[in-house]
Swiss-Prot record:
HAMAP family xref list: AceK
Coiled-coil stretches: none
Record carries keyword ATP-binding: yes
EC number per UniProt: 2.7.11.5, 3.1.3.-
UniProt keyword terms in alphabetical order: ATP-binding, Cytoplasm, Glyoxylate bypass, Hydrolase, Kinase, Nucleotide-binding, Protein phosphatase, Serine/threonine-protein kinase, Transferase, Tricarboxylic acid cycle
Protein name: Isocitrate dehydrogenase kinase/phosphatase
Length: 589
């Protein structure tokens, strides 16, 4: 950018309006996140879920509000190029001592991209690259606190850490829980290492709230070694607080931040500091995913796309059609060297799909608003993104021209995708089952049924439950990822197939009963799910009841009664009540 900061009053006023718009957004966002502590203390799980859902819309509301202001007060869509360059420079100046500069830059981009033509989507007019460093931004309270076990010993230090969170609900037996923490840590380490002179426990200032759990996240620094840890705090059966477990493996802590789970509620003045700390204990977790899981989805998208552009500059493979059975609604492609898939809504759907583009987009938004309980892959939604045309395989280009011609345009050497979704790439479950051993088939089918159960009690009916619509993660977890037919459980009518009036009708292969658009007959699932003898054997062993209306009706009733189920992002054998049987079990409502 060759422009210099000038005294253009319009540019200054627009920059000021943009900063005001962002600050209002983050003030509302942070206020909602801060209330998670109150919901946890009160055990108001429904309010917690509602807050996570409502928070998804905050960003777009403030962007639209700011766009309207700029258009009404400044005729922003008719400003000359020099003024827009001045706007960016004045905006940068306003961020020098800002606590969330990276988020503000993304907000600037979101507003600018709604006003400017996409030919302006470069670093002269928007933030294609960050302008303000997020290193060493000071905050009060600080991002993390440090505790020194030399002062009173490790046990007393752990107590001080927990008590500093100042939850307005007493612990059931904190001495017992600290004893469990010490025993679990010793079992993990094998023996206590010698305490070095720099030994300290660093703990993020805010707890991480999700569902019915508050997580304390930190690390022990001892000499040259770092030991990450996470404490899960829940309500006990007595109504008081208990420590449910301690997670000590970095990969298990990473699972907490899986995009298949609901976003955390965290009170952060300097979110970049939280991300930097989390990266120190999960170095393989992309920053884009960490921002997303902290509820900052637009920042996650910004960082993801910057990472993608950088990857494209340093690779030469081509985008290809994703392996697996082709979908009726989505055209899916991938870049083999990058662990994601790109999903475009087709212009014409398969004959069995009675829906339109708006319905599909609404279903994908629904996924962001619900508790995904570790069983639905999150998506990143993009519009008007330019990718190198030369990187698209000819077969994929032909598919795009045939199935989704309105979804893209070619502009010089770029292919511009008008609207698409991105998800983490997984092995389709149907492909996994084809290649799996008998034991692996049994494990995958067991996981598949568990995924359906957990979605159902979280008020999600998958709709199309074919194996191809589920994927297997690198940890062997089965996750649903095809959302065009999902519905709320409470909207469905689960029925038993009525008896045929006479035998000939039953043998005809034609249905003898009427069905409304929301009617579901679980007995029919076996017809399209259990063709393989290996799959049928495993399914009937673990999930026979999924073929009966009673399971679905009971799950439906639980949702209607306001029951909020317990979902644990760690195995039962890590819970203190299982590791140390004398420990009381945390409440399961």
């Amino acid at each position: 950018m060759d422009a210099q900061v000038g005294d253009n009053p319009v540019a200054q006023a627009i920059a000021h309006a943009l900063v005001e718009g962002f600050n209002k957004h983050y003030r509302i966002f942070r206020g909602t996140s801060r209330r998670a502590k109150e919901y946890f203390e009160a055990g108001d799980w429904r309010a917690q879920l509602d807050a996570v859902r409502d928070r998804v819309q905050f960003y777009d509301d403030r962007v639209d509000e700011t766009v309207r202001r700029l258009l009404e007060e400044f005729d922003a869509d008719s400003l000359d190029d020099a003024t827009w360059q001045q706007v960016k420079l004045h905006f940068i100046g306003a961020l020098i001592n800002h606590k969330q500069p990276e988020l503000a830059e993304t907000f600037f981009n979101s507003v600018g991209c709604k006003i400017l033509h996409r030919t302006y989507f470069n670093n002269d007019y928007i933030f294609a690259r960050p302008a303000i460093s997020t290193e060493y931004i000071e905050s009060y309270p600080p991002v993390y606190s440090s505790y020194y076990p030399q002062d009173g010993g490790l046990r007393a230090t752990i107590r001080r850490i927990i008590e500093d969170f100042d939850w307005q609900r007493p612990f059931e037996d904190l001495d017992r829980d600290i004893d469990c923490i010490m025993r679990a840590a010793l079992a993990h380490l094998g023996e206590w290492p010698a305490m070095e002179v720099n030994c300290q426990l660093q703990v993020l200032y805010s707890a991480f709230y999700r569902n019915k759990t508050a997580y304390i996240i930190g690390k022990v620094i001892n000499g040259w070694q770092d030991y990450p840890f996470t404490l899960a705090v829940r309500h006990g059966a007595s109504g008081r607080l208990v420590i449910d477990t301690i997670l000590l493996d970095p990969w298990r802590i990473s699972v907490l931040f899986s995009l298949s789970r609901a976003y955390f509620m965290v009170d952060m003045e300097v979110p970049s500091g939280y991300v930097q700390f989390l990266r120190s204990i999960m170095p393989n977790k992309p920053r884009s995913e960490l921002y997303t899981m902290l509820g900052l989805g637009k920042q996650g998208k910004t960082m993801f796309f910057r990472d993608l552009v950088a990857h494209l500059r340093h690779s030469n493979d081509q985008f290809i059609i994703a392996p697996g059975i082709r979908g009726l609604v989505m055209l899916v492609f991938t870049l083999p060297s990058y662990p994601y898939v790109f999903k475009i809504i087709k212009d014409v759907f398969g004959s069995s799909k009675n829906m339109d583009r708006a319905t599909v987009k609404r279903k994908y938004l629904m996924v962001k608003q619900v508790d995904r309980v570790g069983r639905m892959a999150d998506t990143l939604e993009f519009s008007y993104a330019a990718l190198p045309l030369s990187r698209f395989h000819p077969e994929l280009l032909e598919e795009l021209r045939t199935l989704a011609p309105s979804a893209f345009e070619i502009d010089g050497d770029a292919l511009v995708l008008k609207h698409f979704y991105i998800e983490r790439r997984m092995t389709p479950l149907n492909i996994h089952l084809e290649k799996a051993s008998d034991g692996e088939v049994e494990a995958a089918v067991h996981e598949y049924g568990n995924a359906i159960r957990e979605l159902a009690i979280a008020n999600i009916f998958p709709g199309d439950m074919l194996w191809k619509n589920f994927g297997v993660t690198r940890y062997g977890r089965v996750v649903f990822y095809d959302y065009d037919e999902i519905e709320y459980m409470t909207s469905m009518n689960f029925r038993r197939i009525p008896p045929a009036p006479h035998e000939d009708m039953e043998l005809s292969g034609e249905p003898w009963y009427s069905a409304g658009p929301m009617d579901v007959f679980p007995e029919e699932f076996a017809t399209f799910l259990l063709g393989s003898p290996r799959v049928r054997k495993a399914f009937m062993k673990y999930h026979r009841d999924l073929l009966e209306p009673a399971f679905w009706q009971a799950a439906q009733q639980g949702v209607r009664d306001g029951h909020v189920e317990d979902f644990f992002p760690y195995p039962a054998e890590l819970r203190f009540s299982v590791m140390f049987p004398a420990t009381p079990v945390a409440a399961q409502d």
